[in-house]
Amino acid sequence: MRRFALGLAFCGALLVGGCSSSGDAVDSSDVGGARTINGIVVEAGAELPGVNLSGADLSGAYLVGINLAGADLTGANLSGADLSGANFLDANLYQANLSGANLNIAYLHRADLVDANMSGADLTGADLSGTFLLNTNLRDANLTGADLSRSNRTTADFTGATMPDGTKHP
């Protein structure tokens, strides 16, 4: 069994959890069909608006339809995670690692993705309107049908990405 130490930022943030005020290590396992991420039970579709998950390792997590509106995910590792249909409205994903993540039809309106790594991410049909994509790595990402209107993407790297209209960026 993997063990993770939890910081106080996670305490009380989720519907079911295993944190203590001392930050003791918590086991990772499956509980009643839910997924355990960093020792905290999180189900797909969980409501976690405004939660502080900065620096969290959520790589490979199954978090379909999760609500992380206004959440702080600064420097979080979400690589390879299934975040399809997730809500990241106004979320802070500064320097987050979303490489290879599934973000199909995710709602990222006004999210801060400055310096984020989204290489190889699947953003098919995602709403990225009004996002901050400064220095964001979107190499080889799939943006087919995505909404990039009003996004600040002047320094984003789209090398090899499939653009919203289905064309390949050079």
What are these regions (language model features)?
Residues 15-18:
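C-terminal motif of bacterial Sec signal peptides marking the signal peptidase cleavage site
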Residues 1-8:
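Bacterial N-terminal signal peptides that target proteins for export
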Residues 21-170:
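Tandem repeat scaffolds
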